[in-house]
Design a protein with these regions (language model features):
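Charged, low-complexity intrinsically disordered terminal segments
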Residues: 1-58, 62-232
Length: 232
């Protein structure tokens, strides 16, 4: 299991990340990690230009067969698994050639210069962690976990998935992603998503459907969309 996380949202998780990374079949890496682990705001004072560049890409790919991409973060609030309010978001599940494209894009980020193996950021003493790999018994008996599992087992989506009857929409699909060099501030403008999206949109004759968790097109993007509207 390769887990690549943006380090911006990991405060207080260092021990958990150490534990995960100590497992022989799990490797954790961090995008643009903070040098100051406790007083993180100090990092913005001393290294703002680098730390202000974050990674919003989200993908979950299994065995090169199926992938999930979308806006959902890793957290109970995004899956209706906790007592806190539900954060609604969307994912796309895909099979076919695009899965390899997503895996290749993950590899681009996994090996880019802005990403560091966890062991370069945190000390991971193997001997100390070896005794903690076993999950606490309380995790297996957690009432909230069992409620969530029961919901999953009764979900029509899960039943369709298990039975191989999940209705799929077959379509031509293309993956677009920012150049990971943006983490160093070295990405060319034409290699970033806004320009590439408009290039692909071209001159549509009827309609464009855009689904986004937070769509921030900037002034130039708004102007481009308005030009399309005026053209009908």
């Amino acid at each position: 299991v390769r887990l690549l996380l943006d380090d911006n949202n990991t405060p207080g998780l260092d021990d958990i990340l150490r534990l995960l990374d100590s497992h022989p079949r799990i490797e954790v890496r961090l995008f643009n990690p903070f040098s100051f682990r406790l007083l993180r705001p100090l990092g913005y004072i001393t290294d703002f230009s680098r730390l202000n560049r974050r990674m919003h890409n989200k993908s979950f790919t299994v065995d090169g067969v199926v992938t999930l991409v979308g806006g959902r973060n890793i957290g109970d609030a995004y899956f209706g698994a906790g007592e806190e309010p539900l954060f609604s978001d969307l994912d796309v599940m895909a099979i076919g050639p695009v899965v390899e494209d997503v895996a290749d894009d993950f590899a681009r980020y996994w090996y880019c210069k802005s990403v560091s193996p966890l062991q370069q950021v945190l000390d991971v003493p193997e001997g100390e962690m070896a005794d903690r790999i076993e999950l606490p018994a309380s995790w297996h008996n957690d009432a909230m976990t069992h409620r969530y599992l029961r919901k999953m087992e009764s979900s029509p989506f899960i039943n369709h998935l298990v039975d191989g009857t999940l209705p799929l929409i077959w379509a031509k699909t293309r993956l677009l992603s920012d150049d990971p060099a943006k983490g160093e501030g070295k990405a060319k403008r034409h290699s970033l998503l806004p320009q590439r999206l408009f290039d692909i949109m071209g001159s549509p004759s009827e309609r464009i459907d855009i689904i986004s968790s937070y769509f921030v097109p900037t002034r130039a993007g708004v102007a481009q969309l308005l030009r399309m509207v005026r053209k009908g």
